[in-house]
Amino acid sequence: MANIQDFLTDNMLSNLESAASLAIHSKNNEVVPLHLLWALSVDSTSILNQILNKLNISKEALELEIKSRISKLATSSNVNRENIRFSNELINSLENAKGLMSANGDSYLSVDTWLISESQKSPIKEILAQFLDLREFQKELESLRAGRKMDSKTSDETLDSLNKFGIDLTLKASEGKLDPVIGREEEIERLMQILIRKTKNNPILLGEPGVGKTAIVEALAQRIIKKDVPKSLQNKKVIALDMSALIAGAKYRGEFEDRLKAVVNEVIKSENIILFIDEIHTIVGAGASEGSMDAANILKPALARGELHTIGATTLKEYRKYFEKDAALQRRFQPVNVGEPSVNEALAMLRGIKEKLEIHHNVTINDSALVAAAKLSKRYIADRFLPDKAIDLIDEAAAELKMQIESEPSSLRKVRKDIETLEVENEALKMENDEKNQKRLDEIAKELANLKEKQNALNSQFENEKSVFDGISAKKKEIDLLKNEASLAKARGEFQKAAELEYGKIPSLEKEVEILEDKWKKMSENGVLLKNQVDEDLVAGILSKWTGISVQKMLTSEKQKFLEVEKHLKESVIGQDKALSALARAIKRNKAGLNADNKPIGSFLFLGPTGVGKTQSAKALAKFLFDDEKAMIRFDMSEFMEKHSVSRLLGAPPGYIGHEEGGELTEAVRRKPYSVLLFDEVEKAHKDVFNVLLGILDDGRATDSKGVTVDFKNTIIILTSNIASNAIMNLSGKEQEDAVKNELKNFFKPEFLNRLDDIITFNPLGKDEAYEIVKLLFKDLQMSLENKGIKASLSENAALLIAKDGFDPDFGARPLRRAIYDLIEDKLSDMILADELHENDSIIIDAKDDEIIIKKA
């Protein structure tokens, strides 16, 4: 046995071990050639099965014949790994194959050599002859070998490399497994133009992730099947190379190179294969180790001679990183730039794949849902690209609906749970036999009868709806298959078959679908348990889960929303009508498209004394625009007073501690691209902070320390400052305006001030505003009390007293909040702790003799 192992390939040895396991399973005390043939037939990746698939021969029939013959062999009850042995017949079989191996000039015996040897004589020849033509079988085995020598134990792993390490996209296209590709005509034409060149006929598709590079290659495969390509490309096959499969399991040095070289040789020999390598930058350095070449260097000679037709695909970033450094590799590929499609182009692509998505998910997708997916994904998902993000959105919306359809309807689930609850109660009451319980048992019996009747009715309705639903889905799938068959028939010139399908079977099925859809429509009018329409609300709901932005805000008309911005701000901020009007006007200008597209939504400098509503305005704006006060990201600029602290905004440079964490500003915006950025007390910051802000205000983006560009176009930037507070407090009109301008010019650089959309002055508050602010602040206290079940109201006298006692023009509105704490909340907390206030109580907060009194209503 040891001598036999020395000349067997690893694959052959593995199959012999499988044969021994099968012999033990069959209780045969010897391993014979039949066991080895059986082992090959059950291994789906074996050479035997590859040939059976090519020749369209049933492996199940072959397996039955083998098992039938094995059942006639001698058996033993105590066969195990220790006492199983190779029969003389098998050893002779391997020795005979070894002779053929030597004649072929091989150093090791592989499975294909053994099969050729056995198909010339022996009982195995009789079995194979029942199912296939032996000459054709031997010819296919020799074709797989393609003249290669078995000079290592792993050499036969490279047989039929393209089947092992590649995916035939033209085969997938012929089976209708690829989605239709809409648009991209220019890129596909350029791709074909490069492919039919004499040399350097290798295009490389360059574009951002998700723009549709792979889809362009799939479109080429579909065109080849339909013969919609130049004559020189009509018989080509597009094979996608699976780099992970190529590298996986390559245990020994040189094994990866052997596999890749085998693939290259197969492609060169066939002359009709176009190799597609997605993420082609992975070949640079792949397999390289001390004393061995990387994959790129193996491909270069064949690429330069034009013997290897290759299409690559990678991103611009990876192309610059890997290809531009290797000039020899770069010049062997011709770039084809694939840009991000517009919203309208992405919408056309979505409409193209709509039918496939509907068939897969068994739902109907409204056109409004496609429009919403294209527009909302463009607006709200800034770090990804069309059409991928829009396709993902519509696909997930359809998946959510499919999950609902395949689950028990909520109304049916509720009835079932009610029945279960009553049955549990029924069993519990039966244990206690008294008059009161008997009365309740009678009630439960009636309720259960009603619920079970309702459950039966709902079940019946659900089954009827499901049968119509499944019928529509099955017919649509059949139509899709027939359409693909008709398309292939046309490409093959079988016009009679195409006509039979297009004018016979397909219209007949479409009529059946129409009848079922009419039936569904009538059922829908009476109310249905199953929802089968993917609409814009569902799409917006999915996007809301992704981004955290409210669904209602997405679907509200943008114009209508921004027309109301001033009104909403004035509800939250008191006494700053002029400042809020200026803020609202600037935002409306931006949203009307009168500002540059590459800038933030708005950038403002809020000036004014403390406590006048600068920060509150920013919070109110965040709440209105993004439906969440937490959408305001606040930076206390007193933390950035020193030069070294400025790097915290964009991140520490490479080599410094904290580099991997990124910048506080850039990371915050990457996580929440739709937000209000508040830079509080900006005059305290180091002057270098303003250099960082210049680029953001001008271009709407910033590059962090890791080289990642962060988009600020969906943010509102607000800077607050107490500069010129004295002038604002003590002056008014033109005099105030001039004094403020002079102080700003003395502190800020002109280029910084020029980049701001507006400088907004917040004026000091008066006693009238203080009264309104007290009423606004009291609403927060009211809500807290309502959560405890206590209703509270504030009298006018009490509000006036709090405004009088708490207002200080030098400190603005902040002392008013402290006055509410001192005058109201302290007394309320004492009453609650003393059990003087309970749930469902109502109180009135009033004032008498300059003192706040709290009384129950």
UniProtKB/Swiss-Prot annotation:
Region (NBD1), start-end ranges = 160-340
Residue positions binding ATP 2: G608, P609, T610, G611, V612, G613, K614, T615
Keywords attached to this Swiss-Prot or TrEMBL record, sorted alphabetically, are: ATP-binding, Chaperone, Coiled coil, Cytoplasm, Nucleotide-binding, Repeat, Stress response
Q: What is its main location?
A: cytoplasm
Region named C-terminal: 765-857
Segments carrying the region annotation (Linker) are: 341-548
Name any one Pfam family assigned in the record: AAA
Query: Where would you find this protein in the cell?
Result: Cytoplasm
Coiled-coil regions, chain positions:
391-525
Query: What is an example of a GO molecular function annotated in this UniProt entry?
Result: ATP binding
Describe the location of the Clp R domain by residue ranges.
Answer: 4-147
Renumbered residue ranges of the record's region Repeat 2: 86-147
Family under the similarity heading:
Belongs to the ClpA/ClpB family.
State whether it acts alone or in a complex, and with which partners, per the record: Homohexamer. The oligomerization is ATP-dependent.
Q: What does the function comment of this entry state?
A: Part of a stress-induced multi-chaperone system, it is involved in the recovery of the cell from heat-induced damage, in cooperation with DnaK, DnaJ and GrpE. Acts before DnaK, in the processing of protein aggregates. Protein binding stimulates the ATPase activity; ATP hydrolysis unfolds the denatured protein aggregates, which probably helps expose new hydrophobic binding sites on the surface of ClpB-bound aggregates, contributing to the solubilization and refolding of denatured protein aggregates by DnaK.
Instruction: List the PANTHER family hit by this protein, alphabetically.
Output: ATP-DEPENDENT CLP PROTEASE, HEAT SHOCK PROTEIN 104
Name this polypeptide is given: Chaperone protein ClpB
Could you read off the lineage of the organism from its UniProt record? Bacteria, Pseudomonadati, Campylobacterota, Epsilonproteobacteria, Campylobacterales
The gene that this protein is the product of is: clpB
